[in-house]
């Protein structure tokens, strides 16, 4: 790391404390077992609402609602066809309003009517791991 007093900063460089940075401190977490039942690999990015991931991924979507992968920003997890693995999820922060993704939620994650509508949409669309 450059010493800012020496005037040798690199554009875009981050100056951080020497102490380790704890990611997602104090946020709710959950672990789900995910199986890729499809015939192609599926890659999921760090900030994607995990509930809305590819319908071929089989896991407890009820548990995953309102959560994302607990991995550093800008990274992803790849699920190979037929493979099963455990992943840790973390609660989405901020205002907890989700739009886009696969269009299942489009609203406030903490609103019970929005949650029920999202579960119904996922079940109707054939997402694996939704019990309805």
From Swiss-Prot:
SUPFAM superfamilies for this protein = Urease, beta-subunit (SSF51278)
What species was this sequence derived from?
Answer: Natronomonas pharaonis (strain ATCC 35678 / DSM 2160 / CIP 103997 / JCM 8858 / NBRC 14720 / NCIMB 2260 / Gabara) (Halobacterium pharaonis)
The protein's annotated catalytic reaction(s) are: urea + 2 H2O + H(+) = hydrogencarbonate + 2 NH4(+)
Q: Kindly list the biological process annotations in GO that this record carries.
A: urea catabolic process
Tell me what this protein is called: Urease subunit beta
The UniProt entry, under Gene3D superfamilies, shows: Urease, beta subunit
Pathway listed: Nitrogen metabolism; urea degradation; CO(2) and NH(3) from urea (urease route): step 1/1
List the gene name: ureB
Q: What class of enzyme is it?
A: hydrolase
**Family to which the UniProt record says this protein belongs:** Belongs to the urease beta subunit family.
Under the heading CDD domains, the entry gives:
Urease_beta
């Amino acid at each position: 790391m450059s010493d800012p007093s020496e005037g040798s900063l690199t554009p875009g460089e981050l100056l951080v404390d020497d102490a380790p940075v704890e990611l997602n401190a104090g946020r709710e977490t959950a672990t789900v077992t995910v199986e890729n039942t499809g015939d192609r690999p599926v890659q999921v990015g760090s900030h994607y609402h995990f509930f809305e991931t590819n319908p071929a991924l089989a896991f407890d979507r009820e548990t995953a609602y309102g959560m994302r992968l607990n991995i550093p920003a800008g990274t992803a997890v790849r699920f190979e066809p037929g493979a099963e693995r455990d992943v840790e999820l973390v609660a989405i922060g901020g205002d907890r309003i989700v739009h886009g993704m696969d269009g299942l939620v489009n609203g406030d994650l903490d609103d019970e009517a929005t949650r029920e509508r999202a579960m119904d949409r996922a079940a109707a669309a054939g997402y694996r791991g939704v019990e309805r």
